[in-house]
Amino acid sequence: MKTYVSNEYDVIVVGAGHAGCEAALASARMGEKTLLLTISLDMVAFMPCNPSVGGPAKGTVVREIDALGGEMGKNIDKTYIQMRMLNTGKGPAVRALRAQADKWDYHEEMKRTIENTPNLTLRQAVVDDLIVEDGECRGVVTNTGARYRAKSVVLTTGTAARGRIFIGELNYSSGPNNTIPAIKLSESLERLGFKLRRFKTGTPPRVNRHTIDYSKTEEEPGDKEPRHFSFTSRDEDYLTDQTSCWMTYTNPKTHEIINENLDRSPMFSGDIVGVGPRYCPSIETKVVRFADKDRHQIFLEPEGRKTEEIYVGDFSTSMPEEVQLEMLHTVAGLEKVEMMRPGYAIEYDVVDPWQLTHTLETKRIKHLYMAGQMNGTSGYEEAAGQGLIAGINAALSAEGKPAFTLGRDEAYIGVLIDDLVTKGTEEPYRLLTSRAEYRLLLRHDNADLRLTEKGHDLGLIDDDRYAEFLAKKELIQEDLDRLGEITVHPTIAVNEYLAGLGQTDLNGGVKADVFLRRPRVTVEDVERLTGQKLAGDRYVKEQVEIDIKYAGYIKKQEIQVARLRRQEAKKIPKDIDYDQIEGLATEAREKLAKIRPETLAQAERISGVNPADLAILSVYVQNGKYAKVQK
């Protein structure tokens, strides 16, 4: 095809899913002239699978995105139809906020934000090729022949890269939700030497809300107490007219139908070669893998206020359409349900993420960044977190400024990216609280304290919001100091309160911060029992209470972080030749040469590098033997 020279930009972002939107907004807000290209303007920030944001670990990522100046938290706070805090009976390290989204409002609100952002141009186009000159990415070429030049390019292709949809025996080339797939871009990446592989994900059927018998299901309402993802959202704006979700279960009859039709499932017939997600398996996989279970939970989730569609959560399937309907009709409450869209599996290309650095720049091509599902992750939140980091670094690169990264001790986003570039992934990667060694430091409640300063330094947090943040920090310290001054006396009221908690009496006066360390004692209880009011609002009090109750555990993790940072400070030279280092095990040598860790701490986290290998590498790097080998 004949090409023509179109406009020139500082940063080009390819793909306008959750990763692409964050990348483009970050770049534009940092002052870079940015172009956001999408296969379809109707798919901007679209939710092709579950209509929700947040959950364990993921909800904290959304708070981190917001603390850094990203958009996902603000957008969901404007468009949710239900909000719930999960794991409230557990410790603060695993509490998680989850919102049910109006997926259509979410898309429209994000598109409106992008269209009204200075420095940002949104355009519909299919990117077929990259412009690469002397090992540097300098733009893209579309299927209409337009050549857009840029200083940096961010790829966020999602599941569109050579996407193929499967519904029983039917399969066809397609992106998510029957959009155009991106075929030639994958071929371009392969020509440039990138290693691609095939992953698979899936989505469940959507059913008509009016054909459900809700009397046979269990209602899951939202929280009455105000909850927000964005630190800028106000309690007075909290939605009180929330929409319920509903829960039901599969049963032995459902499982019987699935087992009878496994030969028609592309997951089991061999038609699908891509690796599926471990933590979000299809209903067929669950029935086969957990044959001892006679039922599996199903959640019925509204997709919005202006649609009749209900998402049948935890019922992902690629069975033939008529089998899907037969399966649904066995479920309590769904006996007469009408299916509006069948579920499907989608297979797509991903780039092995060990080919990236912690900035999400590729090692092979400079100024080329990748983010989202094309890096092997699953989930909107993981994609958005990567998109934000890629967009920040693309903007910094365009200005010739130092890169920005987050460590495992600083954010779940840091854990996510480090896992990807250090360990790679053999299946769609899902972020879990268990993946974070320092999860007591990486909580939902303190994301602003961890990251707002960084967002302000980057130019993504304005001065007014930064002033509010500093005021909150001052109030936290003021209330911590105040609790160290207030005395709780052993009054009748105090000891009756303790007896109600099943605790021993107070025999003498103690400082309020010491009293607060007792189990189930809250800041509000201390205020009531002492008659002393603290200065902060409920969010400040929450922070103060956690800081006091978990002080010992937090201190322990801070000591571990200090050790990590000492190891992170020990840089490995980029041009080190691992073949010249004697004593390394063969597996360690191969893994180190493939991943090329930047620090000794990263090398330590590589599977296959044992303590003996690390000790040898440490000696070579720290004692100057590296230099001798080079000579």
From Swiss-Prot:
Cellular compartments annotated: Cytoplasm
Amino-acid positions noted as binding FAD in the UniProt annotation, renumbered to this chain: 15-20
Claim: Signal is one of the keywords in the record: no
Keywords: Cytoplasm, FAD, Flavoprotein, NAD, tRNA processing
Chain positions recorded as NAD(+) binding sites: 276-290
GO CC, any one term: cytosol
SMART domains documented for this protein: GIDA_assoc_3 (SM01228)
Main location: cytoplasm
Superkingdom in the source lineage: Bacteria
GO biological process: tRNA methylation; tRNA wobble uridine modification
Region (Disordered): 214-233
An example Gene Ontology molecular-function term: flavin adenine dinucleotide binding
Pfam families, A to Z: GIDA, GIDA_C_1st, SAM_GIDA_C
Cofactor: FAD
PROSITE patterns in UniProt: GIDA_1, GIDA_2
Similarity field: Belongs to the MnmG family.
Functional summary from the UniProt entry: NAD-binding protein involved in the addition of a carboxymethylaminomethyl (cmnm) group at the wobble position (U34) of certain tRNAs, forming tRNA-cmnm(5)s(2)U34.
UniProt subunit comment: Homodimer. Heterotetramer of two MnmE and two MnmG subunits.
Protein name as it appears in the record: tRNA uridine 5-carboxymethylaminomethyl modification enzyme MnmG
Species name: Lactobacillus delbrueckii subsp. bulgaricus (strain ATCC 11842 / DSM 20081 / BCRC 10696 / JCM 1002 / NBRC 13953 / NCIMB 11778 / NCTC 12712 / WDCM 00102 / Lb 14)
